[in-house]
C-alpha cells in the first residue's frame, strides 16, 4: 500500500463526488494516491460510487489508474461490478488494464458475472479476443448453468 494515509473527510468527498472540494484538498497537498485503511484511493472510491466528474478530475491530477486496494481490486474491477460504462471509458482511456487480476478474476469476469454488456463491449474493443473470462471463471459459469 501507498504510505500516504487518506483522511476520512477526503474519502467522503470522493464517495459523494465533491469534485471542487477534492480539487482544493489536492491543491493544498493531499496526495492523489493516498489510501485508506482498506487500501482504497480517491479514484477507487469515486469510481465505485459512480462519480464520473470526480474520476475525470482525479485522472487529470495523475491518479494511478491500476493501484489496487487491500483486496487486490482496481478501480476498473469495481466499475465492471457496478456497471458504470462512462467511468469504465475514462479509466480505459487513461490506461487501465482490462485484464488485471483481481484475486483470481478480472474486470471481464465481473462484467460477465453481473451482466454488464456495455462494459464487456468496451473491454473487448480494447483487448479483442484477450478480453474473455478466465478459464476458472468460465468453468464456474458453465457449472452454474448446468445446476
Go through each PLM region and give its residues.
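Hydrophobic packing within well-folded, soluble alpha/beta domains
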Residues: 22-25, 32, 42-46, 55-58, ...
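Ankyrin-repeat boundary/linker signal
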Residues: 35, 68, 100-101
Amino acid at each position: 500500500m501507498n504510505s500516504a494515509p487518506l483522511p476520512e473527510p477526503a474519502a467522503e468527498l470522493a464517495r459523494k463526488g465533491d469534485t471542487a472540494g477534492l480539487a482544493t484538498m489536492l491543491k493544498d497537498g493531499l496526495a492523489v494516491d493516498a489510501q485508506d485503511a482498506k487500501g482504497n484511493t480517491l479514484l477507487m472510491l469515486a469510481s465505485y460510487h459512480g462519480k464520473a466528474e470526480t474520476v475525470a478530475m482525479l485522472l487529470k491530477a495523475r491518479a494511478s489508474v491500476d493501484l489496487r486496494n487491500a483486496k487486490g481490486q482496481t478501480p476498473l474491477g469495481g466499475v465492471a461490478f457496478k456497471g458504470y460504462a462512462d467511468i469504465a471509458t475514462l479509466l480505459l482511456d487513461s490506461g487501465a488494464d482490462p485484464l488485471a487480476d483481481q484475486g483470481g478474476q478480472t474486470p471481464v469476469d465481473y462484467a460477465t458475472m453481473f451482466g454488464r454488456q456495455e462494459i464487456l463491449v468496451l473491454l473487448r474493443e480494447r483487448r479483442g479476443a484477450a478480453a474473455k473470462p478466465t478459464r476458472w471463471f468460465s468453468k464456474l459459469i458453465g457449472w452454474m448453468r448446468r445446476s
